[in-house]
Amino acid sequence: MPLTCMTVLTREGTSELMRHRDVALILATGGSEMVHAAYSSGTPAIGVGPGNTPAFIERTADVPTAVRRIIESKTFDYSTICASEQSVVADAPVERAVREEFVRQGGRFLNPDEAARVASVIFNAAGKMNARLVGRSPQMIGEAAGVEVGPEARVLLADQSGVGRKFPFSQEKLCPVLAFYTEDGWENACERCLELLNYEGAGHTLRDRKSVV
């Protein structure tokens, strides 16, 4: 174990480490409290906020490749990093092809009842991610929710028609679960992507609205 690695983690120990004279810069991720503590430590700090990254699959896209890359990203460390995709926005003309390709590559679409069950276990009453299911497999999430998930499933997908508290999968999910949207045309898809970014993660990957158009 390197000498620079803390083997016992406590709030007090983390606070002392951030204020230590030999620490030149803090890269803080893990939530707003952690970022606030880093900014208040007196040491130069860079804070990382939640990422709510959407992936738009446009009608001329190579669908198998797009789906493969999304799944590879979402299943890396079971989506414990905030840079992984959180939502898929499919262009209407290729929606069916996208759905079929996800299933072919290990996607498991949840029906409305299953989606409600999964939402109830991966989020708490305040709408925050349940820490016990961060970075857990689709099978473990399914077991916790009382939803049968086969061994072939690599990611879970839930259809959503909007963004906000009434649509729980529209926020960051640090586990292999994706929201699925369908929009007709890149303009509508762009608006949906902006809506997702503005709901949670605004400024994380996008600062200038004009830059995407």
Model-derived regions, located:
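Glycine-rich oxoanion-binding loops at beta->alpha junctions
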Residues: P2-G13
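Buried hydrophobic positions in well-ordered alpha/beta secondary-structure cores of metabolic enzymes
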Residues: L3, I26-L27, G51, D91, ...
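Short acidic active-site motifs
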Residues: E12-S15, M34
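Short, surface-exposed connector motifs at secondary-structure boundaries
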Residues: E16-L25, N198-H204
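Glycine-rich phosphate-binding loop
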Residues: I26-A38
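Structural motif
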Residues: L27, F56, V89, L178-F180, ...
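ALDH superfamily catalytic-core signature
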Residues: V35-G164, A189-C193
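Conserved C-terminal structural/oligomerization subdomain of aldehyde/semialdehyde dehydrogenase
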Residues: V147-V213
